[in-house]
Structure formats: structure tokens, C-alpha cells
A protein has these predicted regions:
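C-terminal catalytic/motor cores of large multi-domain enzyme assemblies
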Residues: 1-189
Length: 189
């Protein structure tokens, strides 16, 4: 998390305020590129297919209830564009102006409860999607790195998946790739 937090701090000084969720979306999209078979869907009629685009949802609380708007074709967007589209979807959600299209075609959604001081939790997959990524609070903790005691920022991520669409090995590789991608951040597509 150290690299990610430094990136956000440096970008904020340049006038770019990137949310953790936007960075996670980019990391997920890069993981889909590394493991294209993980970008899959299973429909109740038994149909299984690999998706061409990276469509990622986000849990948004509003006075109208919890909604999961989807940012579509993230694989075609830079981090700045992802961040902008994410902010737009959040505002549409809070203004109760989402269309049915805004809520459809997601493969994975992010549920981030870090702002509620929750370090770890399990989230339930939205019907029709393959995954949900539960994101906990960023916190400092002690850990050992190469035999040396360090203090660093840590975040817990929990990936739940529909095993009809993806097996545990591929899901584990996908999650590991997301974690690695969170430390390799750029504004590239």
C-alpha cells in the first residue's frame, strides 16, 4: 500500500485526486488483461462466456438505497477517465438518476467499507455478476519484510466468486494480480 498511498499523495499535489476505488478498478482491469478467462460470466440458463470489455461496478450508498452502478469498458480508459466516470456514476446514484443500463453488464463489483472503519468483511455477489471485491480500511500494522520488522499501511481485500463461472485457482491468480497491480499505478490505459 505504500506505493499506492505515495502515488495518491504525489498526484494530489499535482491537482489529480484519484480515489482508491478508481485505482482498484484500473488494477482489476489489468488483472483481466493478464487472466482473460477470469473476465467471464455464467448465466442462469447455463450459458458461459468470456467478456470482451472490462465492466466493473461499485457499491454506492444513497438516501435511495444501495445501488451498484457499472463503469463500462474500463479497459479503454486511463486512470483519469476511470476516476471521472466513477465520480459521475456516484453523483448519478446519489441524485437517483441512474438508468437500467447504468446498473447492467458488470462482471465484478467493489464494495468498500473502509470509510466505516471496517478492516475486513465478506460481501455477497450481485446476481448476474461473477465476483465481488470486499475492500477494508487502510491501517498501519507491524510486519516482517526480509527478516526486518517494518511498520506499513495494509488493506484487506476479500474476493468472492461464483464457482460456476470461475474455479478457485483462477480466482486466486486473479486476486493476486489485482494486489500486484495496486503497486504499479499509471494513468495509461
Amino acid at each position: 500500500m505504500t506505493t499506492l498511498l505515495k502515488f495518491r499523495k504525489d498526484q494530489k499535489l499535482k491537482g489529480n485526486k484519484y480515489s482508491l476505488n478508481a485505482i482498484l478498478m484500473q488494477a482489476i482491469s489489468k488483472a483481466f488483461k493478464t487472466f482473460p478467462n477470469s473476465n467471464c460470466s455464467y448465466k442462469d440458463n447455463g450459458e458461459f462466456f468470456i467478456n470482451d470489455h472490462h465492466n466493473i461496478g461499485i457499491a454506492v450508498d444513497s438516501k435511495f438505497g444501495l445501488k451498484m452502478p457499472v463503469i463500462k469498458k474500463i479497459n479503454d480508459l486511463s486512470l483519469k477517465q476511470i476516476n471521472s466516470n466513477l465520480n459521475d456514476k456516484i453523483n448519478l446514484t446519489r441524485d437517483n438518476k441512474l438508468t437500467p443500463s447504468d446498473l447492467s453488464d458488470g462482471v465484478i463489483s467493489i464494495s468498500n467499507l473502509g470509510s466505516f472503519n471496517i478492516r475486513s468483511f465478506d460481501a455477497i455477489i450481485l446476481p448476474g455478476q461473477t465476483y465481488i471485491l470486499a475492500v477494508g480500511q487502510i491501517f498501519e500494522d507491524v510486519f516482517v519484510d526480509k527478516g526486518k520488522i517494518e511498520i506499513g499501511s495494509i488493506i484487506n481485500l476479500t474476493l468472492s466468486c461464483d464457482h460456476r463461472a470461475v474455479d478457485g485457482v483462477l480466482a486466486s491468480q486473479f486476486l493476486s494480480s489485482i494486489v500486484q497491480n495496486m503497486e504499479i499505478i499509471s494513468d495509461d490505459k
